[in-house]
């Protein structure tokens, strides 16, 4: 599985995720604006953090 791993609005980069079945994108807002984090897996998130998990290559941009 290949997942995007760039932060927020940086140039898209990807990572090969051995043994993973999901990519994720999570985002939240703070004093800097909207922060977006992407990567492999499907993590648990705190209340107030939005999470989208998906199962296709590069589906988390």
From Swiss-Prot:
Its main location: secreted. It comes from the Eukaryota. Gene3D superfamilies: CD59. One of its GO terms (molecular function) is ion channel regulator activity. The record marks 56 as: May be the main cause for the toxicity difference between this toxin and cobrotoxin-c. Disulfide bonds join 3-23, 17-40, 42-53, 54-59. Expressed by the venom gland. GO terms for cellular component: extracellular region. The keyword Secreted applies. It is found in: Secreted. SUPFAM superfamilies: Snake toxin-like. Keywords: Disulfide bond, Ion channel impairing toxin, Neurotoxin, Postsynaptic neurotoxin, Secreted, Toxin. It holds the Pfam family Toxin_cobra-type. Belongs to the three-finger toxin family. Short-chain subfamily. Type I alpha-neurotoxin sub-subfamily. Produces peripheral paralysis by blocking neuromuscular transmission at the postsynaptic site. Binds to the nicotinic acetylcholine receptor. It inhibits muscle contraction with an IC(50) of 0.23 ug/ml. This is Cobrotoxin-b. It comes from Naja kaouthia.
